[in-house]
């Protein structure tokens, strides 16, 4: 059986699902989180980033020492910027026969990983503009099975659930809440902010409201996911589609988004996807009320297709 060393961000259920689908491709997987995510490490990352990086370098060196005598067909990274270039080069020298593959679901503007690109045989990105600018392979994010297998009953309820790390995204959400209140639109949401984000908002003169420090409970998620329409607002430093868009395309929902590039996609239809600009939500009410039919889910965006493309 072929073998993969997988080093990547540990992000909710998504990492486990990626591993499961790699195994379906008949690979044996050895996985390590890319970043130390215990509470102490998170605090160190915020307060003493240089000391944290030294600690993380030692962690990566321990991984390399542990795996130095194991042979792998593929060494897969999902994100790489948390590993020093020195350690990546050392890992590549240790496993010179392996094929090195990188997937980025952040943009170069968010985390500049360009210096790492020459050390990979293939580099994928979720950001279509980065793919064009740096000659990378464009591969959108994916929908996992718990979202792709269940189709939603049509209704006029809008929902949002997600982490908000950027001031612009928070401002957009607050403006949309006001729009919905004014137009009698049912908008269900769970906005999660970290203490760091709250400090950023306060420093920008914004009083945070309508948010939580905690993830939505399973009960609240079931309530939110009764909605047939999703509201999306992207980080303006990134051009790729959010996981929110992909998952809701896969589950057959209607989408309200500010990512105008979606109008160029083969799955786009104006009956299903509404694109707003800045804080102008004119036309959203009519879009919500429209009952025109559209094509449902998008099998090409399911996680199985995503993993297959990564390993091809």
Predicted feature residues:
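Active-site proximal beta-strand in glycosyltransferases
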Residues: 92-106, 124
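Short amphipathic alpha-helix with an adjacent loop that forms part of the alpha/beta core around
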Residues: 63-69, 283-288
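Nucleotide-sugar donor-binding catalytic core of glycosyltransferases
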Residues: 2-21, 27-54, 58-59, 69, ...
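Pol beta-like nucleotidyltransferase catalytic core
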Residues: 180, 250, 254-312
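N-terminal Rossmann-like NAD(P) cofactor-binding module of classical short-chain dehydrogenase/reductase
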Residues: 76
